[in-house]
Amino acid sequence: MALRELKVCLLGDTGVGKSSIVWRFVEDSFDPNINPTIGASFMTKTVQYQNELHKFLIWDTAGQEAFRALAPMYYRGSAAAIIVYDITKEETFSTLKNWVKELRQHGPPNIVVAIAGNKCDLIDVREVMERDAKDYADSIHAIFVETSAKNAININELFIEISRRIPSADANPPSGGKGFKLRRQPSEPQRSCC
């Protein structure tokens, strides 16, 4: 079975639950007292998808303003980006649109984008309507899912959908030696003035 490494980065404001999503996916655990990420953290998880193994190389980026300039370093070369907002904080959804804009301008051209509305277990204090977020995700051709890292809602489904959207390895086969070969130019004899 073929193994594919897929770099995935998580973007979004501080406190939206990016680290909790990663911990729930990789370790199947939830820590209500998790500390904010400083810079970025890295974890991996391998899952089977159809006839391939997908090894997710997950970069969880810091959401604080001071670390925003580092984000391009993490999403460069990514197969997918998960942009997370908190359904209980409208401003995190507004900021999400800036992340999408930056990703479209500076990220890989074929990156798979997923929008994750986290903390869907807090439905009574919702500020971002699911329909509005879904409509926005559809308008930018992104995956949309509401998640709860706390209650393990739609976390695995999010990564399965990313696997589904990433072109299969068969769609981009290696060139099979049909590239070109670099050769040295024959050097001309050295001329001397003496």
Swiss-Prot record:
Keyword Nucleotide-binding found: yes
Lipidation (S-geranylgeranyl cysteine): 193-194
Superkingdom classification of source: Eukaryota
Recorded GO MF terms: GDP binding; GTP binding; GTPase activity
Motif position, Effector region: 34-42
Chain spans, region Disordered: 170-194
InterPro entries assigned to the protein according to its UniProt record, in alphabetical order: P-loop_NTPase, Small_GTP-bd, Small_GTPase
NCBIfam families: small_GTP
Family named by the database record: Belongs to the small GTPase superfamily. Rab family.
Subunit relationships: Interacts directly with ZFYVE20. Interacts (in its GTP-bound form) with RINL and RABGEF1. Binds EEA1.
Name of the protein in its database record: Ras-related protein Rab-22A
Organism: Canis lupus familiaris (Dog)
